[in-house]
């Protein structure tokens, strides 16, 4: 870090997402000075909030791992507001702020939150750098945030290329057992030695479905169709995050093994990277699978990310299927999966080589911490 003594990192996923309206009982609101005072008052009664108190740290810079937190939805995402408050606070303390590896996007399921954007403008303009992970976010930043030091680097997860492609191979479940599988004998029987296909959910399932049952029914139909059309392959569901919890019901209904949410991330990455095809509306799992050359069939998501990653990977056709596919769309997904599998190693090599390029590019992002505005 050169002259910097210490750097604070904010990690997203700490804060509950979803439809959130500010409450009089909560510390966060659109007035960040008031929010900071409220936070400090809340700490005695809620000690877990103490980590957010920047006064306790001896630091020179705050580095924000932006990822997918900054989707400008109405009502606002809570994690977006809290991370913005921390950036505001750090700048007020005279500290440097680096916003890295971020996405800036509209929410396809609500009105664009201009109030949040206006609140962020002075914060972003004071930051040392605003670095986004794909071209869609770069253009969005150009349109909405003036006077910022804007940079573009691929998602940091591409830097895992060497780890995903080392010599260790996962052939069965005993090497990747998470807590949920600790007493599950069937988990030991997971067979990754023969060709297999992976399926996960999408970040848009909650917004697109009327209820949990609708999502379960649609994905059960999809999974059964895939199993029927690809009898020569093992089929695995992948519970990527809490939003994919409904896949546990799909697993029971369709009698399909599921790779649980608590499975070690590197193990899941290797499993996805060696799948013949990955059907998903998830961004980071798609990157993990691509690192091994696995072609992805994308369903829509809660932002532009499932389109932007296809452009980043230089897909010949940019295509998103409905997050809750009907019978015709399921048939299209099956057709696309078969086409991609039949392209074999030529397609896999093309994807993998592109990921190697992106991994070499994203590693350069660390140099931003040594640069001056």
Which residue ranges define each predicted feature?
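Active-site anion-handling motifs in enzyme catalytic cores
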Residues: 1-373
């Amino acid at each position: 870090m050169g002259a910097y003594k210490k750097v604070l990192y904010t990690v997203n996923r700490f804060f509950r997402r979803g439809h959130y309206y500010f409450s009089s009982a909560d510390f966060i609101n659109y007035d960040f000075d008031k929010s900071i005072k409220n936070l400090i008052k809340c700490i005695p009664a809620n000690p877990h909030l103490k980590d957010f108190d920047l006064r306790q740290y001896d630091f020179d810079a705050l580095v924000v791992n932006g990822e997918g937190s900054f989707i400008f939805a109405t009502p606002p995402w809570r994690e977006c507001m809290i991370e913005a408050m921390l950036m505001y606070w750090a700048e007020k303390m005279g500290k440097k702020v680096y916003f890295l590896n971020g996405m800036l996007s509209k929410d396809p399921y609500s009105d664009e939150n201009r109030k949040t954007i206006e609140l962020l403008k002075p914060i972003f303009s004071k930051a040392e750098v605003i670095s986004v992970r794909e071209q869609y976010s770069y253009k969005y930043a150009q349109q909405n945030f003036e006077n910022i030091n804007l940079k573009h680097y691929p998602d940091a997860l591409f830097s895992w290329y060497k780890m995903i492609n080392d010599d260790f191979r996962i052939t069965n479940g005993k090497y990747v057992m998470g807590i949920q599988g600790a007493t599950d004998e069937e988990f030991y029987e997971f067979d990754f030695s023969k060709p297999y296909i992976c399926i996960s959910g999408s970040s848009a399932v909650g917004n697109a479905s009327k209820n949990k049952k609708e999502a379960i029914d649609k994905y059960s139909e999809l999974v059964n169709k895939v199993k029927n059309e690809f009898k020569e392959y093992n089929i695995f569901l992948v519970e990527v995050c809490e939003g994919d919890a409904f896949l546990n019901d799909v697993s029971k209904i369709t009698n399909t093994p599921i790779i649980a949410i608590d499975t070690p991330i590197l193990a899941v990455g290797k499993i996805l990277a060696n799948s013949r095809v990955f059907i998903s509306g998830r961004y980071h799992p798609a990157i993990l699978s691509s690192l091994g050359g696995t072609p992805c069939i994308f369903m829509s998501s809660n932002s532009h990310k499932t389109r932007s990653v296809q452009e980043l990977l230089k897909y010949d056709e940019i295509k998103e299927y409905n997050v809750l596919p009907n019978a015709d769309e399921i048939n299209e997904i099956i057709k696309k999966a078969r086409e991609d599998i039949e392209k074999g190693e030529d397609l896999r090599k093309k994807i993998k080589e592109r990921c190697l390029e992106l991994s070499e590019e994203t590693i350069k992002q660390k140099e931003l911490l040594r640069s001056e505005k």
